[in-house]
């Protein structure tokens, strides 16, 4: 959230609610992030001279719970050079709910790669963000028409609550 300013703060509460609903439905929750020092791999932040470890910290309000996977990556996609695809195959995932920073970078790259691996993707509009609203909206439009269902957080939470009720009744 250090690179996306005010837009990032607006996504905190919807993302917190989404995480709670996913956990209640018994779905695996997986985080991706980076370390500031990635053995010489340079990022835009590093080129600007502003890269710090704090830039990549997961905010306390959204912190992983014990047992939730945190995938450390060196590039925009959570899949590139990481064990993410192996883990998703192991847990039998068929669909992914994707959110985070930035819509035009990491969210887009991970969504395109997930689509290429055959996953059905949902990108949650209020739980993604970018440096500019224009960039955010254009990328959501493009992702929706090619690689994912872009949905509102309330719709996704409603589906997750229904799934939780179904699993509880079973």
State each model region's role.
Residues 1-65, 159-170:
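Active-site acidic carboxylates
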Residues 131-145:
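Active-site-proximal loop->helix
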Residues 24-27, 92, 118:
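Glycine-centered short loops/turns at secondary-structure junctions
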Residues 59-101:
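Internal catalytic-core helix/loop-beta-alpha segment
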Residues 71, 148-158:
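Short acidic-hydrophobic, aromatic-tinged amphipathic segments that line or gate anion-handling sites
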